[in-house]
């Protein structure tokens, strides 16, 4: 199958459920853990339903406004979600402790980059050049924002994604051990990578 017939479009609030589902895939369950920690704010909802509510917002890093969807024949087959990482010294959390399971992800960032928070494709649409196309879109977004680099996190066990990112010029900057949890589908290390635009 080729990239032919695949279109890209800005996400809308109505896409929030699909965004949450794809984000769950790209994070290998990490966001399911995040959404589970918010369950007291959303009683009776499953993690992906909580994610959909959060992505329906127009504000914040985790908003549909930061996502581009890939479609084929009217069906969403993938997504790219990005947001800028704050400049160094711009402030941040007010000293609240970080959840130990999330600490590795919280500390791995590169200021002044466009962070790819989710690059996901459904199983039957991988290996078609769509990931490369999405990284190209992210590079365009970074240039539009005046940023000169991209950043992302990837699990060392995700060989397919690592191969794509290395081919696209990403290099390892740092890594941290994954804290095991039943909702997180990976072990080993999570790797912080950057690439020029």
Segment roles from a protein language model:
Residues 7-22, 27-34:
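A short beta-loop-alpha structural element at the N-terminal edge
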Residues 28-55, 65-66:
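Conserved GNAT-fold acetyl-CoA-binding loop/helix
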Residues 56-69, 85-90, 115:
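A short helix-loop-beta-strand connector motif used in the catalytic cores of GNAT acetyltransferases and
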Residues 75-78, 160:
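Glycine-rich acetyl-CoA-binding "A-motif" of GNAT/NAT acetyltransferases
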Residues 81-118:
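Conserved acyl-donor/pantetheine-binding loop and adjacent beta-alpha core of acyl/acetyltransferases
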Residues 113-114, 135, 142-153:
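Conserved GNAT acetyl-CoA-binding A-motif
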Residues 121, 127-144, 163-167:
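Conserved acetyl-CoA-binding loop-helix of GNAT-fold acetyltransferases
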Residues 148-151, 155-162, 167-168, 178-197:
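C-terminal "cap" of GNAT-fold acetyltransferases
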């Amino acid at each position: 199958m080729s990239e032919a017939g695949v279109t890209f479009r800005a996400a809308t609030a109505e896409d929030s459920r699909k965004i949450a589902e794809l984000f769950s895939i790209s994070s290998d369950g990490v966001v399911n853990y995040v959404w589970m920690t918010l369950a007291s704010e959303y009683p009776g909802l499953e993690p992906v339903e909580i994610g959909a509510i959060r992505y329906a917002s127009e504000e914040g890093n985790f908003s549909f406004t930061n996502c581009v969807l890939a479609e084929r024949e009217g069906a969403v087959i993938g997504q790219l979600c990005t947001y800028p990482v704050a400049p160094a010294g711009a402030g941040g959390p007010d000293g609240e402790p970080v959840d130990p399971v999330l600490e590795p992800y919280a500390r791995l960032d590169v200021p002044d980059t466009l962070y790819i928070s989710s690059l996901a494709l459904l199983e039957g649409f991988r290996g078609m050049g769509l990931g490369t196309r999405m990284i190209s879109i992210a590079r365009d977004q970074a240039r539009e924002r005046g940023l000169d680099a991209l950043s992302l996190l990837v699990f060392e066990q995700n060989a397919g994604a690592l191969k794509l990112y290395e081919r696209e010029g990403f290099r390892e900057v740092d890594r941290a051990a994954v804290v095991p949890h039943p909702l997180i589908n990976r072990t080993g290390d999570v790797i912080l990578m950057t690439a020029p635009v």
